[in-house]
Amino acid sequence: LPICPSGSVNCQVSLGELFDRAVKLSHYIHFLSSEMFNEFDERYAQGRGFITKAVNGCHTASLTTPEDKEQAQQIHHEDLLNLVLGVLRSWNDPLLHLVTEVQRIKEAPDTILWKAVEIEEQNKRLLEGMEKIIGRVQPGDTGNEVYSRWSGLPSLQLADEDSRLFAFYNLLHCGRRDSHKIDNYLKLLKCRLIHDSNC
C-alpha cells in the first residue's frame, strides 16, 4: 500500500511509522541480499577463489560510509540520512541490470532471479520511503543528488564465464555489504530521531 495516496491532503502517517516501515524494508532487503549471495556462492563460486579477489571492489566505495556503530554515532542525522539516500540511489542502476543479466546465467535457479526482482522493487520502495522521511526531517530538502555511478554492466556480459561469474559474485557481495550498512544506519537513525537515543 502506498504510504500516502498522491494528492491526499489529510495524510497523517507519523515519522515513527515511516521509520518502522523503512527499517522493516531494509531488514527484508538485507535478508534477501544475503540469501541471494549465499545461493550464488554455493552454486557458482566454489573452488574459484572469488572471495580473495572480492576485496574493496564495490562501486559505492566512493561514498564514505562509517565502518561501525561508533563511527556512525558521530555523524549528524541529516548527513546520515543523505548517505542512506546516496547508497540507495547508487543501487538503482545495478539492480535493474542484475535482473536482466542474471537470466542469462547458465541454469540460473528461479530463486536467484526472483530475489533479484524482489530486491530491485523493494529498493525502489525504500528509496521512496527515505525521500518521505527526509521531507519530514528536513522540510524543503529532498536530499542531495549524490550517488555513485556504476559502470559494471560490461563485466556482467563478458564472454569468459569465469570473469562474468566473478562480476556477479562481486556485485552480490557488495549488495549484501551495503544492505547491511543501510539496515544498521536506519536502526540507528530511528533510535536517535524517534526514541531520543534511548534504545
UniProtKB/Swiss-Prot annotation:
Instruction: List keywords of the entry alphabetically.
Output: Disulfide bond, Hormone, Secreted
For whether the record's keyword set contains Secreted, the answer is: yes
One Pfam annotation, family name? Hormone_1
An individual GO BP term: response to nutrient levels
Entry's Gene3D superfamilies?
1.20.1250.10
- Tell me a Gene Ontology molecular-function term this record carries: hormone activity
Q: Where in the cell is it found?
A: Secreted
Q: Name one GO cellular component term.
A: extracellular space
Q: Which cysteines are joined by disulfide bonds?
A: C4-C11, C58-C174, C191-C199
Protein family per UniProt: Belongs to the somatotropin/prolactin family.
Annotated protein name in UniProt: Prolactin-2
Q: Which organism is it from?
A: Crocodylus novaeguineae (Crocodile)
